[in-house]
Amino acid sequence: ACAATCGTVCYTSSAISSAQAAGYNLYSTNDDVSNYPHEYHNYEGFDFPVSGTYYEFPILKSGKVYTGSSPGADRVIFNDDDELAGVITHTGASGNNFVACT
């Protein structure tokens, strides 16, 4: 089952967890790959279920964990306590904005 759908891409909860874990591991060791994860400022004003400083990390439709190069359109958002805030995408958004995955 899809835990999040970004455009036509279905993400399982395990795929989301894997992306979040990889992103948070880099964040917690003050490391990054191709400038990810980086702080996500929520200019779009999403009503996330957790608070804190947010970070974005790519989630890939291939199911692989992001290790650099093209990040694609989709991002997992987590906070500095490693709590999942949501999954968002550039797909269907104008310019460099994001919309929520459903």
Swiss-Prot record:
Gene3D superfamilies (alphabetical): Microbial ribonucleases (3.10.450.30)
Record key words, sorted: Disulfide bond, Endonuclease, Hydrolase, Lyase, Nuclease
EC number per UniProt: 4.6.1.24
Pfam family, one: Ribonuclease
Annotated catalysed reactions: [RNA] containing guanosine + H2O = an [RNA fragment]-3'-guanosine-3'-phosphate + a 5'-hydroxy-ribonucleotide-3'-[RNA fragment]
GO molecular function, one term: RNA binding
Coiled coil: none
Family matches, as InterPro entries: N1-like, Ribonuclease/ribotoxin, Ribonuclease_N1/T1
Organism listed in the record: Penicillium brevicompactum
Active site: 38, 56, 90
Keyword hit for Mitochondrion: no
Protein name: Guanyl-specific ribonuclease Pb1
Residue pairs linked by disulfide bridges in the UniProt entry: 2-10, 6-101
Protein family per UniProt: Belongs to the ribonuclease N1/T1 family.
SUPFAM superfamilies, alphabetized: Microbial ribonucleases
